[in-house]
UniProtKB/Swiss-Prot annotation:
Its cofactor is Mg(2+). It is a multi-pass membrane protein. Pathway: Cell wall biogenesis; peptidoglycan biosynthesis. It is found in: Cell inner membrane. It catalyses: UDP-N-acetyl-alpha-D-muramoyl-L-alanyl-gamma-D-glutamyl-meso-2,6-diaminopimeloyl-D-alanyl-D-alanine + di-trans,octa-cis-undecaprenyl phosphate = di-trans,octa-cis-undecaprenyl diphospho-N-acetyl-alpha-D-muramoyl-L-alanyl-D-glutamyl-meso-2,6-diaminopimeloyl-D-alanyl-D-alanine + UMP. Disulfide bonds: none annotated. This is Phospho-N-acetylmuramoyl-pentapeptide-transferase. Catalyzes the initial step of the lipid cycle reactions in the biosynthesis of the cell wall peptidoglycan: transfers peptidoglycan precursor phospho-MurNAc-pentapeptide from UDP-MurNAc-pentapeptide onto the lipid carrier undecaprenyl phosphate, yielding undecaprenyl-pyrophosphoryl-MurNAc-pentapeptide, known as lipid I. One of its GO terms (biological process) is cell division. PANTHER family: PHOSPHO-N-ACETYLMURAMOYL-PENTAPEPTIDE-TRANSFERASE (PTHR22926), PHOSPHO-N-ACETYLMURAMOYL-PENTAPEPTIDE-TRANSFERASE HOMOLOG (PTHR22926:SF5). GO terms for cellular component: plasma membrane. The chain crosses the membrane at residues 27-47, 73-93, 97-117, 132-152, 167-187, 200-220, 237-257, 264-284, 289-309, 344-364. The keyword Transport does not apply.
Amino acid sequence: MLLALAQWLAQDVRFFNVFNYITLRAVLAAMTALLLSLAAGPAVIRWLAAKKIGQAVRNDGPQTHLVKSGTPTMGGVLILIAIGITTLLWGDLTNKYVWTVLVVTLGYGIVGWYDDWKKVVYRDPNGLASRWKFFWQSVLGIGAALFIAFSAKSPAQTELIIPFFKTMAYPLGVIGFITLTYFVIVGTSNAVNLTDGLDGLAIMPTVMIAAAFALIAYVTGHAVYAKYLLIPYVPGAGELCIFLGAIAGAGLGFLWFNAYPAEVFMGDVGALALGAALGTVAVIVRQEIVLLIMGGVFVIETLSVMLQVGYFKYTKRKYGEGRRILRMAPLHHHFEQTGWKETQVVVRFWIITIMLVLIGLSTLKLR
């Protein structure tokens, strides 16, 4: 929106040409989203509290979490509003990838919002039925996969890129690409949601990964840099920097209120949407494996739940009683049960994410 205005004004005042630079607009997007989150946060929290949209806490969870009962949830709405407004302000609205990530993000946000709403307003502990949640996640994931696949301009835009190797890329074909894209988007969405169990635990890794992928998107959308780094050139992908900058800014603004002790929780509306956003971006810039590396915390949290549930069902069938691998899943609760304080778990997981993000960025050059 503002880009179009700047381009029109640039016909008479050359200064406005500066807004054609993606890097400048990405920084402005991050700042705008941050300020929007900080400014609107108190009002959103007050509204959620007034409507008694509070978090229910598991009785079988860590006893230290019982004090969190009633804390306003669905704060992810604040993040999505900041991301949406900022991207529309600073993004190139003629870019197909901008609309792709916006539609997917807001679509998953709506699914998460309805799930949260049923839990906290209608007091339904199960929220949106799992089959319906999975159905709508699948519709959005497959829809995005089809659009990206059939709008690709070259075979390289649908190949699986293997990090650390100069020329190792596997042609996926349409079916393979759609399948991979589906699992990346849906899987990342649910992985972030599973991780969102402690104050600040999910949002800061999301901010770090978004910032790192902003750099990746920039070089992927730049023909010269992409050729130099031996990565696929995806025309228009650079514009995702604005969207990713908005995620980073909105996420930091939300962290202001979500840091321990949290004044508000993200809820499924935020976690599902942010995970889907990261997954969609990774697919567009052809760096799904790099997302797997950077999002290692999300991956291990998801695996901990899968192993815990799988082992419990297996032992119950074999021995007549279910047994557990961990004291409690997801993994962050296991560490709490072993004596780690909540803030220790969160900060240590942040440190791990910093290391993984640096490893992921190193794949751009180490080939």
